[in-house]
């Protein structure tokens, strides 16, 4: 292997490890803050994430020029981005709320059903049909979650509803983005989209936070007095949320779609194992079996979609 090839391999490997670390890290830290630390403010936590994304996106694109700045060219394009921002907000808030009530392992199992909702919304909104064998691969995706739900000792109905809603919203945003920003003149890469979406999200979340979580400031200040690392944890958590988006963009840029798909599936499994080791939440054979069926269904769906285009 040549020196340049070795450097490229090392670079991509470092990217993937960093991507895994930031994604899994922010997930576990969210769970720790919301369930184990007494910080029960998922909407405010999401607003912190969006604030960090807004500031760091601006620095990365405008000052550091990591990617070229893409300008919004019309009021129509701005309204489309704002719509995506609200849907994106809903998915992140729903996911964070669910972490208050569900173990990370089960949260990831439900999140693995994203392809099912993506296929459903693609059909309902664009009438795009896949081959029947592709839809058939989605059966174990859903069946696995049903089985995992029955075998989950920490099952919580409200947490489950929020988690499934967040998963559906994430898929809806993906399909909606393909529809709204489909013309060449309006397409934005994920980093520029984050640059415009995150400040809109902060503006949308501020009144919701004040209404739904009115005591957030007083409780956070009290927690900060009790736990000296409170502000550091919040800051690190928010920066990691941005890093996860940046590294996702870089991994997508430097690897193939198939590699990204495989890495994404494996990432969920790694997150499950690490979360069980850290939080020591009880798991059952039925729960593990259900999650395994879901992951295999996701892999089969990706493969059939690739083959039967």
Swiss-Prot record:
Biological process annotations from GO: mucilage metabolic process involved in seed coat development; nucleotide-sugar transmembrane transport
Alphabetized InterPro entries for the sequence: Sugar_P_trans_dom, TPT_transporter
UniProt record similarity statement: Belongs to the TPT transporter family. TPT (TC 2.A.7.9) subfamily.
Phenotype caused by lack of the gene: Changes in cell wall monosaccharide composition with a strong reduction of galacturonic acid (GalA), rhamnose and xylose content in the sead coat mucilage composition.
Entry protein name: UDP-URONIC ACID TRANSPORTER 1
Membrane topology category: Multi-pass membrane protein
Source organism, top-level taxon: Eukaryota
Keyword Nucleotide-binding belongs to the record: no
Species whose genome carries this gene: Arabidopsis thaliana (Mouse-ear cress)
Tissue: Ubiquitous.
Function: UDP-glucuronic acid transporter that modulates the polysaccharide composition of seed mucilage. Transports UDP-glucuronic acid (UDP-GlcA) and UDP-galacturonic acid (UDP-GalA) in vitro.
Stretch forming the signal peptide: none
Compartments, as annotated in UniProt: Golgi apparatus membrane
One GO cellular component term: Golgi membrane
Keywords: Golgi apparatus, Membrane, Pyruvate, Sugar transport, Transmembrane, Transmembrane helix, Transport
Residue stretches spanning the membrane: 9-29, 43-63, 78-98, 104-124, 131-151, 152-172, 193-213, 231-251, 256-278, 283-302
